[in-house]
Amino acid sequence: MELEKNERINALFAFYQPLLTAKQNDYLQLYYADDYSLGEIATEFSVSRQAVYDNIKRTEKILEGYEQKLHLYAEFEARNQQADRIRDYVLSHYPTDQTLRDLIDGMENLEAK
C-alpha cells in the first residue's frame, strides 16, 4: 500500500509540480524522489519535523485535489492502457507490419513528452 501511495504521489507530482510553491516542490522532491527523512528535511530548512510533515500532507491533499478536478493522471493512464492493448493486438495479428509498429511508437512517444 505504501509503495502504491508513493508511486501515485510521484506521478501526481510529475503532472502538477508547476502548480506548487517552491517550498512544496522542495519538500516533496526531497521526501519522495530523494528519499530524505522528515528530520533531514527539517534540518535542511531549519524548521521542525512537524512543520515538514504538515506541509507534505497538505501538499499531498492539494495534488489529489488537482487530480480530482483535472484528471490528467487518470487520462494519461487510460491512454497508456489503450496503447498497450493496441500494441498487443498489432503484434499478435500483424507481427510483420513495421509501419503499424512505428505508428504506435510515435503515439507513445507523444505521451512521453
Curated annotation (Swiss-Prot):
InterPro entries: RNA_pol_sigma_r3/r4-like, UPF0122, UPF0122_fam_protein, WH-like_DNA-bd_sf. Transmembrane segments: none annotated. It holds the Pfam family UPF0122. SUPFAM superfamilies: Sigma3 and sigma4 domains of RNA polymerase sigma factors. Might take part in the signal recognition particle (SRP) pathway. This is inferred from the conservation of its genetic proximity to ftsY/ffh. May be a regulatory protein. Belongs to the UPF0122 family. This is UPF0122 protein LAF_1235. It comes from Limosilactobacillus fermentum (strain NBRC 3956 / LMG 18251) (Lactobacillus fermentum).
